[in-house]
Amino acid sequence: MKHGQDARAATAGKGSCKNLVRHLRRIVAVAGFLLVVLHIRADSAVLARALEQEGQHSLAALEYRRAALAATNAADAARWHWLAAHAYAAGHEWKLAGHMLDLVEETGLSGLDVPLVWLRAEQTLAERDWPAADFYFDSLVRRAEGAEWQAYAQRGRSIARLRRGDVAGARGGLESAPLEAVERYAAGRDRRPWVGGLLGLVPGLGYFYSGEIGNGVRSLLLNSLFIWGLVETAQDDQWAVFSVLAFAEFTWYSGSIYGGIDAAHRYNRRRLDAAVDALRDVERPRAVYDTLPVLTLRFEF
């Protein structure tokens, strides 16, 4: 008799969990944000969540990995590994985050498609793997729903393409302010390093070419000072001092040439970084865990 009551209670509990999940999904359909039911008991993640809130992301990730080892099936282990990857990503430990995502991908768990692609896109962008970042952000554009997700994914894809030098592709899907940022970048002109080096033959001009007025003036003054010193010491037959000044002048003069080359590279980097910063000016998804009988992950902007 008691066994029958326990069985009915367990069946009722499972039914209530299923009803809760269906109810949450209906809410999500109205609210428009992504929600993932992880089917993990919330009390199993209490310590890890507390560590994350304290900013101890590495320790939190270890707790999630410990839970993955104790999981009774591959699907649950994959969910714990995704949580570990998210914790590592929050601590900017991208290599470890990537390893955890590899373990998730091995299971082929479909319920984590969008969260998995999102973290992959973040990881590859942080690791400056521009082709891979382009691929994952493009996948996110195709899979994620909602205006906020689309805006985030499209901008991320544009950043990856700009970094790759694909300015035409970076325009894809953009509107208003982000599109204007790409158009401004496309309308501008990079400085050519070889031109900067050639102009550097005249002290300071290589810097002026790339807009580094302060460095240009400094180079011009110092080279002029050394040349004046060379003339004065030669007229006074002070050849020992002349030799020291000649070495210093050779160093500063060659520095003017190489400085012109470096200044051109810096100019191009600043111009690209300005366009990327404008594209980054968008709300990023934030993973929020709801404390329910089953751990639920939703993303807010």
Labelled PLM ranges:
Residues 20-28:
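Bacterial N-terminal signal peptides that target proteins for export
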Residues 76-79, 115, 149-152:
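Start-of-helix register in tetratricopeptide repeats
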Residues 52-96:
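N-terminal, post-signal-peptide region of Sec/Tat-exported proteins
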